[in-house]
Amino acid sequence: MSEETLSKKQITRLNKLQKRLRREVGSAIADYNMIEEGDTVMCCLSGGKDSYAMLDILVNLLQRAPVNFNLVAVNLDQKQPGFPEDILPAYLDSLKVPYHILEKDTYSIVKDKIPEGKTTCSLCSRLRRGTLYGFAQKIGATKIALGHHRDDIIETMFLNMFYAGKLKAMPPKLLSDDGANVVIRPLAYSREKDIAEYAELKAFPIIPCNLCGSQENLKRAAVKEMLKSWDKQFPGRIETIFTAMQNTSPSQGVDRDQFDFVSLKQDPDAPMKGDVAESDLPAFDFLDLANSGHIDLDAAKRSSDLLKIDVVSTYTP
């Protein structure tokens, strides 16, 4: 499929997806101040649907963004067997985007360290990340753009909860441990299914990600299936989960490193409250015997109203 052969219905759908993805990327960039005046953004291109979509949207953003920035695409050829070396250069030449194709045989390292049949993705990604971080410094890139989307972020949170005992995900913007690189994820607000459909309609020249023969990450696959089931059974739940991730309250949690529970003390000089809402009352019941329900103390301003209140279950020694 190519854009020239799309039906009228498909073109309409493509335009709708394009507007949605561009809007979401623009919002994510603005919310997290991902791209600033004079930045050089190194767009990491793997050949998968996500990185293609990210590059496509960032190229468009170059022309209309309120700030001036430079964009350079970078692909790391990790010497996996069967990797088509001509696809990405041809595609990037057609876009007229500056790019670098790096070569580093991390495949041999991974095969040497990981037993046959085991998932190699974790080690492979760490080696790839180290190479890309170093190259970003070499070319003076101020931001490293990765193609992780909203589903990746949510899946990572549940993986860490279930298997690592941590409430930790992928931040839309990250400073590397050594402080040398800033990583951004412009697709942080975008759904994987929208990206997949967009990539198909745009006919990106996708390169398979399993050329190495690695087994699928079964834990991530299980979490992905769980979220897919929730999305089908409870529409809106995934959106609510992501919203919750943006609205954390350390004082209402149990992590002592995030909030100083140990030092919490009552303030003896705190002013006494006059009229109080029912939610602020101590742990005994105020009952309105007239209607056998709770009475609104804020509405009970007259003394005759207050006579209706019967205080129960109190004790004075």
Curated annotation (Swiss-Prot):
EC numbers on record: 2.8.1.-
Claim: Transferase is one of the keywords in the record: yes
Note on cofactor: Binds 1 [4Fe-4S] cluster per subunit. The cluster is chelated by three Cys residues, the fourth Fe has a free coordination site that may bind a sulfur atom transferred from the persulfide of IscS.
GO cellular component, one term: cytoplasm
Family annotation (InterPro entries): Rossmann-like_a/b/a_fold, TilS/TtcA_N, tRNA_Cyd_32_2_STrfase
Keywords assigned by UniProt, alphabetized: 4Fe-4S, ATP-binding, Cytoplasm, Iron, Iron-sulfur, Magnesium, Metal-binding, Nucleotide-binding, RNA-binding, Transferase, tRNA processing, tRNA-binding
Cofactor(s) needed: Mg(2+); [4Fe-4S] cluster
Record pathway: tRNA modification
Residues annotated as binding [4Fe-4S] cluster: 121, 124, 212
Gene3D superfamilies on file: HUPs (3.40.50.620)
Chain ranges for the short sequence motif PP-loop motif as given in the UniProt record: 46-51
Organism superkingdom: Bacteria
GO MF term (any one): magnesium ion binding
Self-association state and partner proteins as the record states: Homodimer.
Family per record: Belongs to the TtcA family.
PANTHER family xref list: AMINOTRAN_5 DOMAIN-CONTAINING PROTEIN, SULFURTRANSFERASE-RELATED
Miscellaneous notes: The thiolation reaction likely consists of two steps: a first activation step by ATP to form an adenylated intermediate of the target base of tRNA, and a second nucleophilic substitution step of the sulfur (S) atom supplied by the hydrosulfide attached to the Fe-S cluster.
Task of the protein: Catalyzes the ATP-dependent 2-thiolation of cytidine in position 32 of tRNA, to form 2-thiocytidine (s(2)C32). The sulfur atoms are provided by the cysteine/cysteine desulfurase (IscS) system.
Protein name in UniProt: tRNA-cytidine(32) 2-sulfurtransferase
Native source organism of the sequence: Shewanella loihica (strain ATCC BAA-1088 / PV-4)
Upper classification of the organism: Bacteria, Pseudomonadati, Pseudomonadota, Gammaproteobacteria, Alteromonadales
